[in-house]
Amino acid sequence: MQLIDTNIRDFDQLRREHRWQIPENFNMAEAVCDRHAMDEDRVALFTETATGRCNRFTFAQLKELSNRFANALRSMGVTVGDRVAIVLPQRVETGLCHLAAWKLGAISLPLSILFGPDALRYRLEDSGARVVIAAGAALDRVHALMPDLPSLERVIDCDDQRDGFWPLLEKGSAGLEPIQTQSDDPALIIYTSGTTGPPKGAVVAHRCLLGNLTGFEMSQNFFPQEGDLMWTPADWAWTGGLLDALIPAWYYGCPVLGYDGGRFDAEQACHMIARYRVRNAFIPPTALKMMRQVGDLRALGVDLRSVMSAGETLGAQLYEWAMSALGIGINEMCGQTEFNYIIGNCSEIMPVKPGSMGKAYPGHVVEPMDENGCKLPIGKIGELFAHRDDPVMFLGYWNREQETKEKLNGDWWSTGDIGYRDDEGYLWFVGRKDDVISSAGHRIGPGEIEDCMLKHPAVLQAAAIGSPDKLRGEIVKAFIVLADGFKASKGLQEEIQNTVRTSLAAYEYPREIEFVHDLPLTTTGKVRRVELRERERRRKGLTNS
Protein backbone atom coordinates (compact mmCIF):
# COMPACT_ATOMS: atom_id res chain seq x y z
CA MET A 1 0.00 0.00 0.00
CA GLN A 2 3.01 2.32 0.43
CA LEU A 3 3.98 4.42 -2.58
CA ILE A 4 7.61 4.67 -1.49
CA ASP A 5 9.93 1.65 -1.75
CA THR A 6 11.24 1.38 1.81
CA ASN A 7 14.12 -0.82 0.64
CA ILE A 8 15.65 2.17 -1.15
CA ARG A 9 17.45 4.38 1.34
CA ASP A 10 18.60 7.06 -1.07
CA PHE A 11 16.34 10.11 -1.42
CA ASP A 12 17.54 11.10 -4.88
CA GLN A 13 17.18 7.53 -6.19
CA LEU A 14 13.60 7.46 -4.92
CA ARG A 15 12.92 10.67 -6.82
CA ARG A 16 14.45 9.33 -10.03
CA GLU A 17 12.57 6.03 -9.96
CA HIS A 18 9.12 7.19 -8.84
CA ARG A 19 6.22 6.94 -11.32
CA TRP A 20 2.64 7.90 -10.54
CA GLN A 21 -0.13 5.36 -11.12
CA ILE A 22 -3.40 7.27 -10.81
CA PRO A 23 -6.56 5.23 -11.46
CA GLU A 24 -9.31 6.63 -13.67
CA ASN A 25 -11.88 6.15 -10.90
CA PHE A 26 -11.06 7.07 -7.32
CA ASN A 27 -13.18 8.14 -4.36
CA MET A 28 -11.55 9.36 -1.18
CA ALA A 29 -14.29 8.02 1.09
CA GLU A 30 -13.84 4.49 -0.22
CA ALA A 31 -10.05 4.79 -0.09
CA VAL A 32 -9.75 6.15 3.44
CA CYS A 33 -12.65 4.38 5.13
CA ASP A 34 -14.74 1.73 3.41
CA ARG A 35 -11.91 -0.53 2.25
CA HIS A 36 -10.65 -0.84 5.85
CA ALA A 37 -14.09 -1.72 7.24
CA MET A 38 -13.74 -5.46 6.54
CA ASP A 39 -11.68 -5.66 9.74
CA GLU A 40 -14.44 -4.81 12.21
CA ASP A 41 -12.00 -4.13 15.06
CA ARG A 42 -9.68 -1.78 13.18
CA VAL A 43 -9.64 1.53 15.07
CA ALA A 44 -9.91 4.71 13.00
CA LEU A 45 -10.38 7.47 15.55
CA PHE A 46 -9.94 8.27 19.21
CA THR A 47 -11.67 11.46 20.39
CA GLU A 48 -11.40 13.39 23.62
CA THR A 49 -13.04 16.59 24.83
CA ALA A 50 -11.94 19.25 27.30
CA THR A 51 -14.21 17.65 29.91
CA GLY A 52 -12.43 14.31 29.51
CA ARG A 53 -15.15 12.52 27.54
CA CYS A 54 -13.47 9.87 25.38
CA ASN A 55 -14.71 7.79 22.47
CA ARG A 56 -13.30 5.26 20.04
CA PHE A 57 -14.55 4.55 16.51
CA THR A 58 -13.63 1.76 14.12
CA PHE A 59 -13.52 2.03 10.34
CA ALA A 60 -16.54 -0.27 10.22
CA GLN A 61 -18.47 2.17 12.40
CA LEU A 62 -17.37 5.15 10.29
CA LYS A 63 -18.51 3.36 7.14
CA GLU A 64 -21.96 2.66 8.53
CA LEU A 65 -22.41 6.10 10.10
CA SER A 66 -21.22 7.96 6.99
CA ASN A 67 -23.52 5.83 4.83
CA ARG A 68 -26.44 6.79 7.04
CA PHE A 69 -25.59 10.49 6.91
CA ALA A 70 -25.05 10.33 3.14
CA ASN A 71 -28.56 8.92 2.78
CA ALA A 72 -29.88 11.67 5.05
CA LEU A 73 -28.19 14.30 2.85
CA ARG A 74 -29.56 12.63 -0.26
CA SER A 75 -33.07 12.85 1.18
CA MET A 76 -32.52 16.63 1.44
CA GLY A 77 -31.70 16.76 -2.26
CA VAL A 78 -27.90 16.88 -1.99
CA THR A 79 -26.40 15.46 -5.17
CA VAL A 80 -23.24 15.40 -7.29
CA GLY A 81 -21.35 18.70 -7.16
CA ASP A 82 -23.36 20.28 -4.34
CA ARG A 83 -21.36 22.01 -1.62
CA VAL A 84 -21.69 20.78 1.97
CA ALA A 85 -20.09 23.13 4.52
CA ILE A 86 -18.60 21.74 7.74
CA VAL A 87 -17.95 24.17 10.61
CA LEU A 88 -16.74 21.80 13.32
CA PRO A 89 -13.65 21.14 15.47
CA GLN A 90 -11.80 17.83 15.85
CA ARG A 91 -14.78 15.54 16.48
CA VAL A 92 -16.11 12.42 14.78
CA GLU A 93 -18.92 14.29 13.01
CA THR A 94 -16.30 16.25 11.06
CA GLY A 95 -14.91 13.12 9.46
CA LEU A 96 -18.36 11.64 8.90
CA CYS A 97 -19.56 14.76 7.07
CA HIS A 98 -16.61 14.68 4.67
CA LEU A 99 -17.01 10.95 4.02
CA ALA A 100 -20.76 11.29 3.43
CA ALA A 101 -20.33 14.19 1.01
CA TRP A 102 -17.67 12.34 -1.01
CA LYS A 103 -19.83 9.21 -1.20
CA LEU A 104 -22.53 11.30 -2.90
CA GLY A 105 -20.08 12.96 -5.28
CA ALA A 106 -20.72 16.23 -3.44
CA ILE A 107 -18.01 18.73 -2.49
CA SER A 108 -17.16 19.22 1.17
CA LEU A 109 -16.34 22.73 2.35
CA PRO A 110 -14.32 22.80 5.60
CA LEU A 111 -14.63 26.09 7.51
CA SER A 112 -12.94 27.12 10.74
CA ILE A 113 -14.97 27.42 13.94
CA LEU A 114 -12.94 30.60 14.55
CA PHE A 115 -14.53 32.41 11.61
CA GLY A 116 -16.69 35.39 12.46
CA PRO A 117 -19.86 36.34 10.56
CA ASP A 118 -18.15 38.24 7.74
CA ALA A 119 -15.71 35.42 6.99
CA LEU A 120 -18.50 32.82 7.08
CA ARG A 121 -20.87 34.90 4.97
CA TYR A 122 -18.32 35.42 2.22
CA ARG A 123 -17.32 31.75 1.96
CA LEU A 124 -20.84 30.37 2.17
CA GLU A 125 -22.13 32.86 -0.39
CA ASP A 126 -19.20 32.45 -2.77
CA SER A 127 -19.36 28.65 -2.68
CA GLY A 128 -23.15 28.47 -2.87
CA ALA A 129 -23.25 25.90 -0.07
CA ARG A 130 -26.63 24.15 0.22
CA VAL A 131 -26.11 22.56 3.64
CA VAL A 132 -24.09 23.55 6.71
CA ILE A 133 -23.24 21.26 9.63
CA ALA A 134 -22.12 23.16 12.73
CA ALA A 135 -22.32 23.35 16.51
CA GLY A 136 -21.99 25.84 19.35
CA ALA A 137 -21.17 29.48 18.64
CA ALA A 138 -20.44 28.75 14.97
CA LEU A 139 -23.97 27.38 14.59
CA ASP A 140 -25.44 30.60 16.00
CA ARG A 141 -23.40 32.68 13.55
CA VAL A 142 -24.56 30.58 10.59
CA HIS A 143 -28.22 30.75 11.67
CA ALA A 144 -27.98 34.55 11.83
CA LEU A 145 -26.62 34.62 8.26
CA MET A 146 -29.30 32.44 6.66
CA PRO A 147 -31.48 35.35 5.45
CA ASP A 148 -28.48 36.65 3.46
CA LEU A 149 -27.68 33.28 1.86
CA PRO A 150 -30.34 32.24 -0.69
CA SER A 151 -28.50 29.04 -1.68
CA LEU A 152 -28.33 27.78 1.93
CA GLU A 153 -31.28 25.42 2.45
CA ARG A 154 -30.45 23.55 5.65
CA VAL A 155 -28.36 24.09 8.79
CA ILE A 156 -27.76 20.96 10.88
CA ASP A 157 -26.93 21.17 14.59
CA CYS A 158 -24.54 18.45 15.75
CA ASP A 159 -25.68 18.85 19.35
CA ASP A 160 -29.46 18.90 18.84
CA GLN A 161 -30.70 15.56 20.13
CA ARG A 162 -34.19 16.02 18.64
CA ASP A 163 -33.73 17.17 15.05
CA GLY A 164 -29.95 17.45 14.71
CA PHE A 165 -27.12 15.43 13.21
CA TRP A 166 -27.51 12.18 15.15
CA PRO A 167 -31.31 11.87 14.86
CA LEU A 168 -31.00 12.49 11.11
CA LEU A 169 -28.27 9.90 10.87
CA GLU A 170 -30.37 7.30 12.70
CA LYS A 171 -33.18 7.78 10.17
CA GLY A 172 -30.83 7.14 7.24
CA SER A 173 -30.29 3.67 5.84
CA ALA A 174 -26.95 1.95 6.47
CA GLY A 175 -26.91 0.65 2.90
CA LEU A 176 -25.29 2.85 0.27
CA GLU A 177 -23.53 2.40 -3.05
CA PRO A 178 -21.13 5.37 -3.25
CA ILE A 179 -21.00 7.38 -6.47
CA GLN A 180 -18.16 6.15 -8.67
CA THR A 181 -16.21 9.38 -8.92
CA GLN A 182 -13.37 9.92 -11.34
CA SER A 183 -10.02 10.82 -9.83
CA ASP A 184 -10.29 14.29 -11.41
CA ASP A 185 -13.70 15.01 -9.87
CA PRO A 186 -13.81 17.74 -7.19
CA ALA A 187 -13.87 16.60 -3.56
CA LEU A 188 -13.16 19.73 -1.52
CA ILE A 189 -13.15 23.50 -1.67
CA ILE A 190 -10.66 25.05 0.74
CA TYR A 191 -10.48 28.83 0.88
CA THR A 192 -6.95 30.18 0.65
CA SER A 193 -5.58 33.48 1.86
CA GLY A 194 -6.31 36.44 -0.37
CA THR A 195 -3.44 38.90 -0.77
CA THR A 196 -5.47 41.31 -2.86
CA GLY A 197 -9.20 41.12 -2.59
CA PRO A 198 -11.15 38.29 -1.00
CA PRO A 199 -9.98 34.70 -0.34
CA LYS A 200 -10.27 32.23 -3.21
CA GLY A 201 -11.78 28.75 -3.07
CA ALA A 202 -9.21 26.16 -4.14
CA VAL A 203 -10.99 23.17 -5.68
CA VAL A 204 -9.22 19.96 -4.66
CA ALA A 205 -9.76 16.73 -6.64
CA HIS A 206 -10.07 13.22 -5.22
CA ARG A 207 -6.70 12.37 -6.84
CA CYS A 208 -4.95 15.10 -4.84
CA LEU A 209 -4.90 12.74 -1.85
CA LEU A 210 -2.76 10.30 -3.86
CA GLY A 211 -0.47 13.15 -4.86
CA ASN A 212 0.03 13.93 -1.16
CA LEU A 213 1.19 10.48 -0.21
CA THR A 214 4.86 10.35 -1.23
CA GLY A 215 5.49 13.46 0.83
CA PHE A 216 3.33 12.21 3.70
CA GLU A 217 5.12 8.86 3.86
CA MET A 218 8.57 10.45 3.83
CA SER A 219 7.83 13.37 6.15
CA GLN A 220 6.61 10.78 8.67
CA ASN A 221 9.75 8.67 8.15
CA PHE A 222 8.22 5.89 6.05
CA PHE A 223 4.66 5.86 7.30
CA PRO A 224 3.00 3.54 8.18
CA GLN A 225 4.80 1.29 10.62
CA GLU A 226 3.53 -1.03 13.33
CA GLY A 227 1.92 0.95 16.15
CA ASP A 228 1.65 4.24 14.26
CA LEU A 229 -1.00 6.66 15.55
CA MET A 230 -1.40 10.20 14.18
CA TRP A 231 -2.22 13.47 15.95
CA THR A 232 -2.09 17.16 15.10
CA PRO A 233 -3.15 20.31 16.94
CA ALA A 234 -3.96 21.83 13.54
CA ASP A 235 -7.63 22.50 12.86
CA TRP A 236 -9.21 19.90 10.56
CA ALA A 237 -10.76 22.81 8.66
CA TRP A 238 -7.41 23.56 7.01
CA THR A 239 -5.25 21.70 4.52
CA GLY A 240 -2.68 20.98 7.25
CA GLY A 241 -5.02 19.27 9.69
CA LEU A 242 -7.25 17.57 7.12
CA LEU A 243 -5.03 16.60 4.17
CA ASP A 244 -1.66 16.43 5.94
CA ALA A 245 -2.80 14.37 8.94
CA LEU A 246 -6.34 12.99 9.28
CA ILE A 247 -7.14 11.82 5.75
CA PRO A 248 -3.73 10.37 4.72
CA ALA A 249 -3.45 8.47 8.01
CA TRP A 250 -6.86 6.95 7.33
CA TYR A 251 -5.74 6.03 3.81
CA TYR A 252 -3.27 3.63 5.41
CA GLY A 253 -5.84 2.37 7.90
CA CYS A 254 -4.04 3.97 10.86
CA PRO A 255 -5.80 5.52 13.86
CA VAL A 256 -5.95 9.26 14.48
CA LEU A 257 -6.42 11.15 17.75
CA GLY A 258 -8.80 14.11 17.67
CA TYR A 259 -9.07 16.61 20.53
CA ASP A 260 -11.98 19.01 20.89
CA GLY A 261 -10.73 21.20 23.70
CA GLY A 262 -10.37 24.74 22.45
CA ARG A 263 -7.12 26.67 22.62
CA PHE A 264 -3.86 24.70 22.38
CA ASP A 265 -2.33 23.84 25.76
CA ALA A 266 1.21 22.47 25.40
CA GLU A 267 1.37 20.62 28.72
CA GLN A 268 -2.05 19.07 28.24
CA ALA A 269 -1.05 18.06 24.70
CA CYS A 270 2.09 16.31 25.97
CA HIS A 271 0.10 14.32 28.53
CA MET A 272 -2.38 13.34 25.83
CA ILE A 273 0.40 12.26 23.44
CA ALA A 274 1.75 10.01 26.19
CA ARG A 275 -1.65 8.67 27.26
CA TYR A 276 -2.68 7.59 23.75
CA ARG A 277 0.85 6.56 22.73
CA VAL A 278 0.88 8.91 19.76
CA ARG A 279 3.74 7.98 17.44
CA ASN A 280 3.36 10.46 14.57
CA ALA A 281 2.41 14.11 14.46
CA PHE A 282 2.09 17.22 12.39
CA ILE A 283 3.05 20.02 14.79
CA PRO A 284 3.47 23.61 13.52
CA PRO A 285 6.56 25.48 14.78
CA THR A 286 4.52 27.72 17.09
CA ALA A 287 3.13 24.68 18.93
CA LEU A 288 6.62 23.17 19.14
CA LYS A 289 7.91 26.39 20.71
CA MET A 290 5.18 26.17 23.33
CA MET A 291 5.97 22.50 23.99
CA ARG A 292 9.60 23.47 24.50
CA GLN A 293 8.53 25.38 27.61
CA VAL A 294 6.94 22.30 29.22
CA GLY A 295 10.20 20.70 30.36
CA ASP A 296 11.42 17.12 29.99
CA LEU A 297 9.01 15.68 27.42
CA ARG A 298 10.33 12.15 27.56
CA ALA A 299 9.89 12.14 31.34
CA LEU A 300 6.21 12.88 30.66
CA GLY A 301 6.02 9.82 28.43
CA VAL A 302 6.21 11.54 25.04
CA ASP A 303 7.66 8.98 22.62
CA LEU A 304 7.15 10.19 19.06
CA ARG A 305 8.56 8.25 16.11
CA SER A 306 8.14 11.05 13.57
CA VAL A 307 7.10 14.70 13.42
CA MET A 308 6.37 16.84 10.37
CA SER A 309 6.25 20.61 10.76
CA ALA A 310 4.96 23.24 8.34
CA GLY A 311 3.26 26.61 8.09
CA GLU A 312 6.30 28.71 8.91
CA THR A 313 10.08 28.28 9.05
CA LEU A 314 11.24 25.84 11.73
CA GLY A 315 14.69 27.32 12.33
CA ALA A 316 17.94 25.76 13.55
CA GLN A 317 17.36 26.33 17.29
CA LEU A 318 13.97 24.63 17.32
CA TYR A 319 15.29 21.75 15.22
CA GLU A 320 18.21 21.19 17.60
CA TRP A 321 15.91 21.36 20.64
CA ALA A 322 13.68 18.66 19.11
CA MET A 323 16.69 16.46 18.42
CA SER A 324 17.62 16.71 22.08
CA ALA A 325 14.14 16.64 23.65
CA LEU A 326 12.46 14.11 21.35
CA GLY A 327 15.41 12.21 19.95
CA ILE A 328 14.21 12.67 16.36
CA GLY A 329 14.79 15.07 13.50
CA ILE A 330 11.77 17.22 12.68
CA ASN A 331 10.88 16.97 9.00
CA GLU A 332 10.02 20.41 7.71
CA MET A 333 7.55 20.40 4.79
CA CYS A 334 6.39 23.06 2.37
CA GLY A 335 3.24 23.14 0.31
CA GLN A 336 0.09 25.08 -0.49
CA THR A 337 -3.56 24.12 -0.77
CA GLU A 338 -3.23 24.54 -4.54
CA PHE A 339 -0.10 22.37 -4.75
CA ASN A 340 0.35 20.56 -1.46
CA TYR A 341 3.13 18.45 0.06
CA ILE A 342 5.70 18.97 -2.68
CA ILE A 343 8.90 19.88 -0.79
CA GLY A 344 10.33 18.59 2.46
CA ASN A 345 12.66 16.34 4.38
CA CYS A 346 12.95 12.72 5.49
CA SER A 347 15.41 12.56 8.38
CA GLU A 348 15.38 8.76 8.20
CA ILE A 349 17.46 8.73 5.01
CA MET A 350 18.74 12.26 4.35
CA PRO A 351 20.70 14.87 6.30
CA VAL A 352 18.40 17.68 7.36
CA LYS A 353 19.75 21.18 6.88
CA PRO A 354 17.99 23.35 9.47
CA GLY A 355 16.52 26.37 7.73
CA SER A 356 16.23 24.61 4.37
CA MET A 357 12.88 23.68 2.86
CA GLY A 358 14.34 20.28 1.92
CA LYS A 359 14.02 18.72 -1.51
CA ALA A 360 11.13 18.07 -3.87
CA TYR A 361 9.48 14.82 -2.78
CA PRO A 362 9.27 11.91 -5.26
CA GLY A 363 6.78 12.62 -8.03
CA HIS A 364 7.08 16.41 -7.76
CA VAL A 365 9.24 18.82 -9.76
CA VAL A 366 10.09 22.27 -8.36
CA GLU A 367 12.43 24.77 -10.00
CA PRO A 368 13.64 28.31 -9.21
CA MET A 369 13.00 30.44 -12.32
CA ASP A 370 13.63 33.97 -13.49
CA GLU A 371 11.00 36.43 -14.67
CA ASN A 372 11.19 34.95 -18.20
CA GLY A 373 10.37 31.44 -17.00
CA CYS A 374 13.92 30.14 -17.43
CA LYS A 375 15.38 27.71 -14.90
CA LEU A 376 18.07 29.27 -12.75
CA PRO A 377 21.49 27.80 -11.92
CA ILE A 378 22.54 26.71 -8.43
CA GLY A 379 22.57 29.54 -5.91
CA LYS A 380 20.57 31.98 -8.03
CA ILE A 381 17.42 33.37 -6.41
CA GLY A 382 14.12 33.26 -8.26
CA GLU A 383 10.49 32.33 -7.93
CA LEU A 384 9.77 28.66 -7.19
CA PHE A 385 7.58 27.00 -9.83
CA ALA A 386 6.05 23.52 -9.64
CA HIS A 387 5.39 21.42 -12.74
CA ARG A 388 1.65 21.05 -13.27
CA ASP A 389 1.80 17.43 -14.52
CA ASP A 390 1.27 16.28 -10.96
CA PRO A 391 -1.72 14.58 -9.26
CA VAL A 392 -1.46 16.87 -6.24
CA MET A 393 -2.21 20.00 -8.26
CA PHE A 394 -5.65 21.44 -7.59
CA LEU A 395 -8.33 21.88 -10.26
CA GLY A 396 -8.51 25.68 -10.08
CA TYR A 397 -10.07 28.50 -8.09
CA TRP A 398 -13.83 28.25 -7.63
CA ASN A 399 -15.53 30.43 -10.29
CA ARG A 400 -12.22 32.25 -10.92
CA GLU A 401 -10.85 30.82 -14.14
CA GLN A 402 -8.89 33.95 -15.02
CA GLU A 403 -7.16 34.09 -11.64
CA THR A 404 -6.19 30.44 -12.05
CA LYS A 405 -4.69 31.14 -15.48
CA GLU A 406 -2.71 34.06 -14.09
CA LYS A 407 -0.82 31.69 -11.77
CA LEU A 408 0.29 29.47 -14.66
CA ASN A 409 3.35 29.92 -16.83
CA GLY A 410 3.00 27.26 -19.51
CA ASP A 411 3.36 23.92 -17.75
CA TRP A 412 4.45 25.52 -14.48
CA TRP A 413 2.51 26.73 -11.45
CA SER A 414 3.64 29.88 -9.67
CA THR A 415 4.02 29.17 -5.93
CA GLY A 416 4.63 32.82 -5.12
CA ASP A 417 7.64 31.82 -3.01
CA ILE A 418 11.12 33.14 -3.69
CA GLY A 419 14.09 30.84 -3.14
CA TYR A 420 17.09 29.02 -4.59
CA ARG A 421 18.64 25.55 -4.84
CA ASP A 422 22.04 24.80 -3.30
CA ASP A 423 24.73 22.51 -4.73
CA GLU A 424 23.29 19.48 -2.92
CA GLY A 425 19.78 19.96 -4.29
CA TYR A 426 18.22 21.50 -1.18
CA LEU A 427 15.76 24.34 -1.69
CA TRP A 428 15.98 27.46 0.47
CA PHE A 429 13.16 29.90 1.12
CA VAL A 430 14.04 33.60 0.79
CA GLY A 431 10.68 35.35 0.92
CA ARG A 432 7.20 35.60 -0.57
CA LYS A 433 6.33 37.13 -3.87
CA ASP A 434 2.87 37.77 -2.52
CA ASP A 435 1.96 39.26 0.83
CA VAL A 436 0.51 36.28 2.70
CA ILE A 437 1.18 36.46 6.44
CA SER A 438 2.34 33.24 8.12
CA SER A 439 1.33 33.34 11.78
CA ALA A 440 1.31 30.31 14.10
CA GLY A 441 0.78 27.98 11.15
CA HIS A 442 -2.06 30.05 9.64
CA ARG A 443 -1.71 31.60 6.18
CA ILE A 444 -3.50 34.93 6.47
CA GLY A 445 -4.38 37.20 3.60
CA PRO A 446 -4.05 40.92 4.28
CA GLY A 447 -6.85 41.86 1.88
CA GLU A 448 -9.66 40.48 4.02
CA ILE A 449 -8.24 42.12 7.17
CA GLU A 450 -7.85 45.49 5.46
CA ASP A 451 -11.40 45.34 4.10
CA CYS A 452 -12.68 44.57 7.59
CA MET A 453 -10.79 47.47 9.20
CA LEU A 454 -12.04 49.87 6.54
CA LYS A 455 -15.59 49.24 7.75
CA HIS A 456 -14.72 51.10 10.95
CA PRO A 457 -15.61 54.80 10.60
CA ALA A 458 -12.25 55.88 12.03
CA VAL A 459 -10.21 54.09 9.35
CA LEU A 460 -9.46 56.01 6.16
CA GLN A 461 -6.70 53.74 4.83
CA ALA A 462 -5.28 50.47 6.12
CA ALA A 463 -2.50 48.03 5.30
CA ALA A 464 -1.77 44.71 7.00
CA ILE A 465 1.59 42.94 6.96
CA GLY A 466 3.40 40.18 8.81
CA SER A 467 5.71 41.49 11.52
CA PRO A 468 8.49 39.13 12.72
CA ASP A 469 7.66 37.40 16.01
CA LYS A 470 9.73 34.84 17.93
CA LEU A 471 6.77 32.71 19.00
CA ARG A 472 4.41 32.86 16.03
CA GLY A 473 6.87 33.43 13.20
CA GLU A 474 4.88 36.51 12.25
CA ILE A 475 2.04 38.47 13.78
CA VAL A 476 -0.47 40.61 11.94
CA LYS A 477 0.44 44.29 12.14
CA ALA A 478 -1.79 47.03 10.76
CA PHE A 479 -0.80 50.51 9.59
CA ILE A 480 -3.79 52.84 9.71
CA VAL A 481 -4.43 56.34 8.40
CA LEU A 482 -7.26 57.84 10.46
CA ALA A 483 -10.24 59.66 9.00
CA ASP A 484 -10.79 63.33 9.84
CA GLY A 485 -12.17 63.88 13.31
CA PHE A 486 -10.55 60.83 14.91
CA LYS A 487 -7.48 60.74 17.15
CA ALA A 488 -5.19 57.82 17.85
CA SER A 489 -5.73 56.23 21.25
CA LYS A 490 -5.40 52.92 23.06
CA GLY A 491 -9.18 52.66 23.18
CA LEU A 492 -9.54 53.17 19.43
CA GLN A 493 -6.82 50.61 18.78
CA GLU A 494 -8.64 48.01 20.88
CA GLU A 495 -11.92 48.87 19.16
CA ILE A 496 -10.43 48.22 15.71
CA GLN A 497 -8.78 45.01 16.93
CA ASN A 498 -12.10 43.76 18.27
CA THR A 499 -13.79 44.58 14.97
CA VAL A 500 -11.46 42.17 13.16
CA ARG A 501 -11.47 39.58 15.94
CA THR A 502 -15.25 39.29 16.00
CA SER A 503 -15.91 39.70 12.27
CA LEU A 504 -13.19 37.44 10.85
CA ALA A 505 -11.24 35.17 13.20
CA ALA A 506 -9.25 35.49 16.41
CA TYR A 507 -5.97 34.59 14.71
CA GLU A 508 -6.47 37.29 12.04
CA TYR A 509 -6.78 40.36 14.23
CA PRO A 510 -3.83 42.80 14.20
CA ARG A 511 -1.87 42.29 17.41
CA GLU A 512 -0.08 45.54 16.69
CA ILE A 513 -1.52 48.73 15.20
CA GLU A 514 0.52 51.75 14.17
CA PHE A 515 -1.33 54.95 13.32
CA VAL A 516 0.45 56.77 10.48
CA HIS A 517 -0.06 59.96 8.47
CA ASP A 518 0.15 58.17 5.12
CA LEU A 519 0.93 54.83 3.48
CA PRO A 520 3.63 54.18 0.84
CA LEU A 521 1.87 53.78 -2.50
CA THR A 522 2.82 52.75 -6.03
CA THR A 523 2.16 55.09 -8.94
CA THR A 524 -1.12 53.24 -9.51
CA GLY A 525 -2.22 53.74 -5.91
CA LYS A 526 -1.49 50.26 -4.53
CA VAL A 527 -0.03 49.99 -1.05
CA ARG A 528 3.65 49.03 -1.08
CA ARG A 529 3.49 46.37 1.62
CA VAL A 530 7.06 45.35 0.84
CA GLU A 531 8.21 48.79 2.04
CA LEU A 532 6.21 48.41 5.25
CA ARG A 533 7.71 44.97 5.84
CA GLU A 534 11.23 46.29 5.32
CA ARG A 535 10.52 49.15 7.73
CA GLU A 536 9.21 46.69 10.30
CA ARG A 537 12.25 44.41 10.01
CA ARG A 538 14.57 47.37 10.55
CA ARG A 539 12.54 48.43 13.58
CA LYS A 540 13.00 44.99 15.08
CA GLY A 541 16.72 44.94 14.37
CA LEU A 542 16.56 42.49 11.48
CA THR A 543 18.21 42.74 8.08
CA ASN A 544 17.24 41.33 4.72
CA SER A 545 20.53 39.55 4.23
Please place each PLM-identified region on the residue numbering.
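Conserved AMP-binding/adenylate-forming core of the ANL superfamily
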Residues: 41, 45-99, 116-121
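Conserved pre-ATP/AMP-binding loop-to-beta segment of ANL
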Residues: 41-43, 157, 172-191, 197-198, ...
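Conserved AMP-binding A3 loop
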Residues: 55-60, 187-214
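Structural core segment of the AMP-binding/adenylate-forming
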Residues: 75, 99, 103-168
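AMP-binding/adenylate-forming catalytic core of the ANL superfamily
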Residues: 115, 132-135, 281, 385, ...
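Conserved AMP-binding/adenylation subdomain of ANL enzymes
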Residues: 210-232, 237-279, 293-294
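Gly/Ser/Thr-rich phosphate-binding loop
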Residues: 251, 278-282, 292-352, 365, ...
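AMP-binding/adenylate-forming catalytic domain of the ANL superfamily
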Residues: 502-526, 545
